Each structure stands twice: as structure tokens, then as C-alpha cells.
Amino acid sequence: MRLRLICVGQKMPDWVSAGYNDYARRMPPELPLELTEIPMAHRGKNPDISRLMQRESDAILSAAGTRDRVVALEVGGRPWSTEKLASQLENWQQDGRDVAFLVGGPDGLADACRQRADQQWSLSPLTLPHPLVRILLAEQLYRAWTITRNHPYHRA
């Protein structure tokens, strides 16, 4: 089983790549965390936002496998505690399908991504910068895995 983070945006600052890579490297070989970056649609003067979101969402959905369990990261999604995420992770591992986490661009995910999602998850009611979401998600997935293994990283 693989955990796949599918994000809109490329050419992240070095600190973002370093933070994400640090946690991705910590994941065990049987549960790799992979990143797929989708180019952000160009937003010039007076852009047609719905058209740009649709273009980004088409690319996101084509990157997600047809059998993947899809989790859309959405402000309107359900909030999960770290312990709930650990429980989800155990369930996903038993299911065996890859899990694709969808992160939209600056305007979010189009309806097609939300409709394809098996679950919608809200990391926070705050608006988070998309580069930070990569690090936060990677850390929380690593933390959830450590909980399932009684690893001392998580001390709640």
C-alpha cells in the first residue's frame, strides 16, 4: 500500500521540500509516502477561476489511480484527531488499496474531486498555505504510523 500526496503547485521553497522529505523518508518501506506535483494553471488578469480549477482537478484525478481510496483535503471536510488518523491508517492498511490525498490549488478543489473522494478531511478550520500543508500532512501521517506501532515519537 502506498500513501500518495497529489498537490497542485511545483517549485516549492527549499524549506518545504526539506520538511516534506524528512517525514517521507521516515515512513517504512511497506508504507511509502509519495508526492505527485500538478502544475498550477496560470492565473493572469481576470482569470476564469472555475475553468482553471477544472483544469487542475482533471490533472489531479488523472494522477489518482482508479482503485485508489481518495481523501480530499477540504476546509469543509471532517476534522480528525491524530488518533483518528491512526485508526484510519490501520483500516486503510487492512483494505490494501493505495490512498491518494488531494490538495487543490489556491482556489481549492473542483466539485469533480470532491465527488470522487471517498472521504473529505479538514486539517484545520484555518486557511493554510499550500506548501505548509505538504509538511503538515507528511508529519501527521508519520505520527499516525508511529501510534500504530507504539513508537515513542508520539507522546500524548
Curated annotation (Swiss-Prot):
Main location class: cytoplasm
Subcellular location: Cytoplasm
EC assignment: 2.1.1.177
Alphabetical keyword list: Cytoplasm, Methyltransferase, rRNA processing, S-adenosyl-L-methionine, Transferase
Catalytic activity: pseudouridine(1915) in 23S rRNA + S-adenosyl-L-methionine = N(3)-methylpseudouridine(1915) in 23S rRNA + S-adenosyl-L-homocysteine + H(+)
InterPro entries in alphabetical order: Alpha/beta_knot_MTases, RlmH-like, tRNA_m1G_MTases_N
Role according to the record: Specifically methylates the pseudouridine at position 1915 (m3Psi1915) in 23S rRNA.
Entry protein name: Ribosomal RNA large subunit methyltransferase H
Organism of origin: Marinobacter nauticus (strain ATCC 700491 / DSM 11845 / VT8)
Lineage: Bacteria, Pseudomonadati, Pseudomonadota, Gammaproteobacteria, Pseudomonadales
The encoding gene: rlmH
